[in-house]
Amino acid sequence: ALHQNYPNPFNPVTQIRYDLPEKSNVTLLIYDILGREVAALLNGEQEPGYHSIMWNGQNRSGQAVGAGMYFYSIQTGQFRQTRKMILLK
């Protein structure tokens, strides 16, 4: 399960929390409102349980992204869930 980020809206950092029922290969991506991938926060195997990861509002190149709505998406096998978050400047 993918939980709502906190804080939301955020500036400059937010925490993304998720639960895994079993050991899984996990991909966690950030997208802009046009569906373009902004950042990949996670791509690898994780143990079951409660996890959290921080996003600092930066893209893959380490540059700060602009204010606005973003989406974060988790995928594990056949499961995929997406939520929205807002970055304020």
Where are the model-predicted features located?
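Short, surface-exposed loop/turn motifs with a glycine/proline- and acidic-biased composition
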Residues: 23, 42-77
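Extracellular and select intracellular beta-sandwich modules with Ser/Thr-enriched
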Residues: 79-83
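Short beta-strand edge segments in extracellular beta-sheet folds
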Residues: 85-89
